[in-house]
Amino acid sequence: CHACEVACKVANNNPAELNYIRVNTVGEVGSFDTATYDTASGTYPNLKLSFVPVQCQHCENPSCVAACPTGATKKDPDTGVVYVDSEQCIGCDSCITACPYEGVRTHVSADPEWYLDVVVGEHDAPIHAGNTVEKCTFCRNLINRGEEPACMQLCPGRARFWGDLDDPSSKVAELVAANEYVRLNESAGTEPSVYYLV
């Protein structure tokens, strides 16, 4: 339904060019390496099509953090969230090049444009400085207040979950333990923290 995309865009007051999440349609769930994008898999009448939200994978070993020459790309030691400090970012795109997950970062243009002439979203939403790189922060401002990221709060299908994977009693840890899952591009060695239940 793309509600997560809309919730994210509004909560973060993102400029028109900036999306932290994109929802891909995938024909074959279970192996993203061989997935068919924007095309159903199977044979009629037994076709399969799934919707897969893709954003920063907030890796345990983020290659983007190591590649950033200014230290602007950081990993929060308490939450594990990977984020970019716009005041330190020089817009060199090293993090984009280093990231094995295509399209999860955006280089914001020098003069970003908004859909509306008024600020929408959270009062403490990220500042969108021109000529910097931005990405999903799992709504750091919200999780620091004890709330869930906007994409998870507004998911009408309750298909998205947030929590501490190291806490076995958390909902997300229980779901991962009880279900089959895949993680994107595991061969890159970054240990993504986003799990897709199949």
Task: Give names to the regions the model predicted.
Residues 1-198:
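Non-ligating segments of multi-cofactor redox enzymes
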